[in-house]
């Protein structure tokens, strides 16, 4: 098959799933802060750390797509 198709599928799936996870994390994090405002700082810290890990997966997908494209 065409390399460009594999690149497109890699970056599409590799960025769509982390985007879904980030949306779910933010939704549940804000819901938890709404229920317990005193714990907002610890919830926010954990939420930002989890979002960073999800973004790392999207960056790995970009790197894999670039490797497929140029190698």
Briefly describe each language-model feature range.
Residues 1-71:
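Hydrophobic alpha-helical transmembrane segments of small proteolipidic membrane proteins, enriched
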């Amino acid at each position: 098959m065409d390399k460009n198709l594999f690149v497109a599928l890699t970056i599409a799936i590799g960025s769509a799933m982390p985007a879904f996870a980030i949306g779910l994390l933010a939704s549940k994090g804000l819901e938890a802060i709404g229920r317990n405002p005193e714990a907002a700082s610890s919830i926010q810290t954990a939420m930002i750390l989890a979002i960073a890990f999800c973004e790392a997966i999207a960056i790995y997908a970009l790197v894999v797509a670039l490797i497929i494209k140029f190698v």
